Amino acid sequence: MEEDRNWIVVPTWRVPGRMEKWHALVKYLKYRTKDLEEVRYVPHHKVGWAWWTCSRVIFPLQGKSHLEIQAYWNLTPEKGWLSSHAVRLTWYTEKFWTDVTPDCADILIHSTYFSCFTAGEVRRAIRGEKLLSCCNYPQAHKAQVPSLQYLALVVVQQNDRPQRKGTARKQWRRDHWRGLRVAREDHRSLKQGGSEPSAPRAHFPGVAKVLEILA
C-alpha cells in the first residue's frame, strides 16, 4: 500500500536569482562593522532529504524572540514552474512562530540593530545644534506612520549633509548604498581570511532591496 504524502506549505517571497549580494552584506555587517555581530549566519547548505538547498540568517531580537531569513535554491526542478529561488521570513519565540512581510522584518531588525535618533535630538535641533545621532535604517520607518519629530529630524539630517553644486543627491545615494558596494568588494577578502581594520558603520537599505524581492 502506497504511503500518503504529507505536504507542508509555507509562504515564500520570490527573488530573481542567487543571493550572493545578501550573503556578502550580512558578512560585511557582522565581521567588519560589527553592526550584526550577534547575528548567526549559516552558509548555503544541503537540507537532509530535500532536493533544495538553503542558507539561514538568524537575528536575535528583544524579548528572547528571533527573526530568521532563509534563502532557498532549486525549489522547482521541473521547468516551467515558479522561480527556483525564494526567501522565507519568520519571527518566532519559544512557543510561537509566524511568517512576516519584508516591511515587518525591517521594523523588527531596526528594533534591535542599527542606530536611530536619540531622545535628545529634538531639543538639539530646536536649539540649532548639530545632531549627535542619525538613523542608519530609514527603510524600517517606511511602513510606519512617522511622527512629526522624526520627519523634522530627517529634514535636519538631510540639510546637514554637504551640498556640492547639485551632487548632494548623488552623494546621498552613494552613502546609502555604501554597505552593498563594500560588501561586493569585501567578500573575496573575507574568504582569504585577511585581517583589516574595522570599517565605518553603513546604512542598511532594507530587506526587500537587498534580496531584490519580487513578490
From Swiss-Prot:
Bilayer topology: Peripheral membrane protein
Keywords noted in UniProt: AIDS, Host cell membrane, Host cytoplasm, Host membrane, Host-virus interaction, Membrane, Phosphoprotein, Ubl conjugation, Ubl conjugation pathway, Virion
Modified residues (Phosphothreonine): 98
Region Multimerization, residue ranges: 154-167
Description of post-translational modifications: Processed in virion by the viral protease. Highly phosphorylated on serine and threonine residues.
Primary site of residence: host cell
Positions of modified residues (Phosphoserine): 147
UniProt keyword Ubl conjugation, yes or no: yes
Localisation per UniProt entry: Host cytoplasm; Host cell membrane; Virion
This protein's GO CC annotations: host cell cytoplasm; host cell plasma membrane; membrane; virion component
InterPro entries: Vif
Highest taxon above the source species: Viruses
Motif (HCCH motif): 110-141
GO BP, sorted A to Z: viral life cycle
Keyword Translocase applies: no
Induction: Expressed late during infection in a Rev-dependent manner.
Extra facts: Required for replication in 'nonpermissive' cells, including primary T-cells, macrophages and certain T-cell lines, but is dispensable for replication in 'permissive' cell lines, such as 293T cells. In nonpermissive cells, Vif-defective viruses can produce virions, but they fail to complete reverse transcription and cannot successfully infect new cells.
Subunit structure, interactors included: Homomultimer; in vitro and presumably in vivo. Interacts with viral Pr55Gag precursor and human APOBEC3G. The interaction between Vif and APOBEC3G is species-specific, which may play a role in restricting the replication of HIV to humans. Forms an E3 ligase complex by interacting with human CUL5 and elongin BC complex (ELOB and ELOC).
Recorded domain comment: The BC-like-box motif mediates the interaction with elongin BC complex.
Sequence similarity: Belongs to the primate lentivirus group Vif protein family.
Function in brief: Counteracts the innate antiviral activity of APOBEC3G. Forms a complex with host APOBEC3G thus preventing the entry of this lethally hypermutating enzyme into progeny virions. Functions as an adapter molecule, recruiting APOBEC3G to the ubiquitin-proteasome machinery. Targets APOBEC3G for degradation through the assembly with elongin BC complex, CUL5 and RBX1. Binds viral RNA and affects the stability of viral nucleoprotein core. May play a role in viral morphology.
This protein's name: Virion infectivity factor
Organism: Human immunodeficiency virus type 2 subtype A (isolate BEN) (HIV-2)
Lineage start: Viruses, Riboviria, Pararnavirae, Artverviricota, Revtraviricetes
Gene designation per UniProt: vif
